[in-house]
Each structure stands twice: as C-alpha cells, then as structure tokens.
Design a protein with these regions (language model features):
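Acidic/His-enriched low-complexity segments
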Residues: 1-151
Length: 151
C-alpha cells in the first residue's frame, strides 16, 4: 500500500469528493529535448482548449524546472505580470483566448534529481519515470490521469 508520507510522494492523495474537472483540454503535446552534460533543455508545446469559458488562469504542475521563456501563440509572457512560478506549479494569469498554443522553454538537471521521478541520472544513464506524477519534474503540465493527449 502506498504511503502518503513517502519522501518520493509529490502531492497528497485526492479524494473523490475533492476532485475538480480540469478547465482545459490538452489534445496535443510536443516535446523537444536537448541533452547537455549538466542539464537538459526541454521545450514543451501544449495545445490548450478551454472547457470553462469563465476560466482566466491556468495552473500547471511542475517541480525543479528553470523557466527560460514562455509564449502564448508566439507572444512572449513576462514573469510576475503574466505568470508566476511557485515551488510545485506554474500559474499563467488572465488568459483571454479559448484556444491557444502554450510554449514553455525550460531547463532541468537530471544529475541533481534524486527523487527517482521525472528525468534523472542513474549510473551514468539518463532515465525517466513519469508514473505517478513524475512528468511534472520534466515539464510543466496538468499531471493528472484524466488528461489524455496525443504526443
């Protein structure tokens, strides 16, 4: 049985009564990895479609990712004004579009990742472990089982 206090556990358990439908669909995802000696540059493109037209903010899961740049439909976003990165997520503010392409250029450090989740280095080999909730250590995403996307 899983232990919610396990050091590799990223988030608390979600009870059925606490479940909320995600406000966006993510029908397509494109990932590009540039692997260097001490880091990996990850470019993520998410096609997003609002399900709830009243939604203004987008919150994506992500841990230990350095943000280089963020774009919505080729428009560069400004930190603090347009988005805010917190310890375990990224909040993109005041999105007016119902259908858009979100591009995030980020950097991760597999050698420093000791969680055995996401992308990490083990015995000189780059390895990935995305289930459960490990993908959020590779790229910002709605890292939950009800989001199905074409990669």
């Amino acid at each position: 049985m899983d232990n919610p206090k396990n050091q590799n556990s990223i988030s608390r358990y979600v009870k059925l009564e606490d479940y909320k439908v995600f406000d966006y669909e993510i029908p397509e995802i494109f990932l590009d990895f540039v692997i260097k000696k001490n880091f990996v540059n990850v470019t993520t493109k998410l096609k997003l479609v609002k399900k709830n037209k009243n939604t203004r903010n987008l919150i994506l899961d992500g841990t230990d990712i350095l943000i280089k740049k963020i774009f919505i439909d080729d428009s560069l976003l400004e930190e603090e004004e347009d988005y805010k990165q917190q310890k375990n997520n990224l909040k993109i503010k005041n999105i007016k579009k119902d259908n858009f392409l979100l591009k995030i250029e980020g950097r991760i450090k597999p050698k420093e990742n000791t969680s055995l989740l996401g992308m990490y280095e083990s015995n000189g080999m780059i390895t990935t472990q995305c289930e459960a909730e490990g993908f959020r250590r590779i790229s910002f995403h709605a890292d939950r089982p009800d989001i199905l996307s074409k990669y």
